[in-house]
């Protein structure tokens, strides 16, 4: 793994340890839990909610996905 990519992951992992990141994920989880499918009135709103949920899931899972990608890259370096 080159230095630039290593720094990218180190900075990302530092971000994940901050109170701000933890608060953001907690807020996103609350918003996600409050979305009710039965309140969706039309197809346009359904697709909008679907997009919102995808973004929320991406952010909620970003830490785990980043850690896995970093581990995979480290394994490639040792092979």
Language-model segments: what does each one mean?
Residues 3, 71-79:
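Short acidic DE-rich linear segments
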Residues 1-30:
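N-terminal acidic leader/helix
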Residues 14, 51-52, 76:
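Small/flexible residues
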Residues 30-69:
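Short, charge-rich amphipathic interface segments used for partner binding and complex assembly
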Residues 6, 25, 47, 60-63, ...:
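Compositionally biased amphipathic helical and low-complexity segments enriched in hydrophobic
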């Amino acid at each position: 793994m080159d230095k630039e990519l290593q720094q990218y992951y180190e900075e990302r992992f530092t971000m994940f340890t901050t109170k701000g990141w933890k608060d953001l994920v907690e807020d996103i989880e609350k918003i996600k839990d409050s979305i009710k499918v039965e309140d969706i009135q039309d197809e346009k709103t359904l697709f909008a909610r679907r997009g919102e949920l995808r973004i929320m899931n991406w952010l909620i899972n970003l830490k785990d996905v980043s850690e896995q990608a970093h581990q995979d890259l480290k394994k490639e370096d040792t092979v």
